[in-house]
Amino acid sequence: MEHRVVGPGPYRATRLWNETVELFRARMPLRRHRCRFKSYEHCFTASEAVDWLHELLRNSQNFGPEVTRKQTVQLLGKFLKNHVIEDIKGKWGQEDFEDNRHLYRFPPSSPLKPYPKKPLYQRDVIKFPEWNDPPPGTSQENIPVRPIVMNSEMWFKRHSIAIGEVPACRLVHRRQLTEANVEEIWKSTTLSYLQKILGLDSLEEVLNTKLVSSKFIIHNVYSVSKQGVVILDDKSKELPHWVLSAMKCLANWPNCTDWKQPMYLGFEKDVFKTIADYYGHLKEPLLTFHLFDAFVSVLGLLPKEKTAIEAFQLCCLLLPPENRRKLQLLMRMMARICLNKEMPPLSDGFGTRTLMVQTFSRCILCSKDEVDLDELLAARLVTFLMDNYQEILKVPLALQTSIEERVAHLRRVQIKYPGADMDITLSAPSFCRQISPEEFEYQRAYGSQEPLAALLEEVIADDKLSSKEKKKKLKQFQKSYPEVYQERFPTPESEALLFPEKPKAKPQLFMWALRKPFQPFQRTRSFRM
């Protein structure tokens, strides 16, 4: 009974449902049963289905050993509701599924769930703020992107050190980095890290990035106590005092120094029920509805524990500060109760750890729209959270360091050369798109030469340069990029055409040189004539 791991990505809950249905229909043992003096072929009892499916789920890396028999019964009830199975008389949809000897069978066909058509939240790539960006609130659609192309003057300034020409420079401060710029850097970098860890081409199918608040991320990073718990600015969003006192009482059991009420037999069960009732009546789960798909997607990384922890760290940074604080306090209490050997049993039917998972999983993670596997997925996530909450709910140091260094770099004094463009010398990181193998081969062969060839033509066509300066720059270009230069000037003759030799001016002849040499007696001969 192998249940392949369903990795991260969109529609993971639906993919898990279809995978489980296919395995159940293909491998559930069928045999002959008798009921009320009548025999039925190719069927199974409810208890047999619970036994087999429970074992499958417990051995699956997608769900884990924490799956209870009760959850398996609930899942089979959903199978009956969705006509994955039917009772022996062909009834399905309205009947309740119970763990008994009732007979069930598979219908001739069991349709798999189609993948839901979700709105594409955001097709644009995540971008860093530029200095030329309009202020927040203005439209940023159809803004042309100016390619970064270096003209000949900038190129020769960059390479002029090689020939000993260092241009004058001065220190300048960059433009003021606004709070909106910093917030956008935090949001863009965090989402970029999450997208990279999940291995997705885009987050649009698992997360609506428009609902992600950069202010939440920054608050969750910097407004924390020495223990790493978020500190809220708005005290009205704090846990009620009586809930916080009850949580401290169970977390420090039996040393309840803050609890002034009299204790009695079963007191700890009533305190636990009080806490469970408060969390169970929250309007929204702690991990929020709009982050459900993101957290479910991260569950596909659980076989790689370290990677899963990093992904959960980033997802938890996106939570509202009040949700993150409530989650931190709840996980600390749950972990301490499970490790406390002096804590009396809080339930007669479950162990302490299983009780924690079953009680709080739905208030931590659930979908706004009913999802057939949300109970199992929530239990899997809460189990992993309990084992790794200290790592998951702390600020990822690598992310914080990367962003702080980038912000400091943007604010640092820069060296500027006359005529240089600061936005070119310090360009923001950009994101890539996938290209075809043919386009890649073309770019590898010609992509780097085309801009250089254009630069060479610009130098050749520059009429402001004297012949001496132009020859000097062409010689420098030839030394740096001989292949490009050779392609433009394949022969010395082609190079000579660029600098044609001017014809030398002949010396002016005097009029007397054109005459014949002086002949003696010339005047005498003229007399004779």
Swiss-Prot record:
Location of Phosphoserine modifications: S160, S436
Keyword Phosphoprotein: yes
GO function terms (MF aspect): GTPase activator activity
Chain ranges of the Rho-GAP domain: 201-393
Residue ranges occupied by any DEP domain in the UniProt entry: 24-108
Site residues (Arginine finger), renumbered to this chain: I231
The keyword Chaperone appears for this protein: no
A GO BP annotation: intracellular signal transduction
Pfam families: DEP, RhoGAP
InterPro entries: DEP_dom, Rho_GTPase_activation_prot, RhoGAP_dom, WH-like_DNA-bd_sf, WH_DNA-bd_sf
Gene3D superfamilies reported for this sequence: Rho GTPase activation protein, Winged helix-like DNA-binding domain superfamily/Winged helix DNA-binding domain
Keywords from the UniProt entry: GTPase activation, Phosphoprotein
PROSITE patterns reported for this sequence: DEP, RHOGAP
UniProt cross-references to PANTHER family, sorted A to Z: DEP DOMAIN-CONTAINING, DEP DOMAIN-CONTAINING PROTEIN 1B
Protein name: DEP domain-containing protein 1B
Organism whose genome encodes this protein: Mus musculus (Mouse)
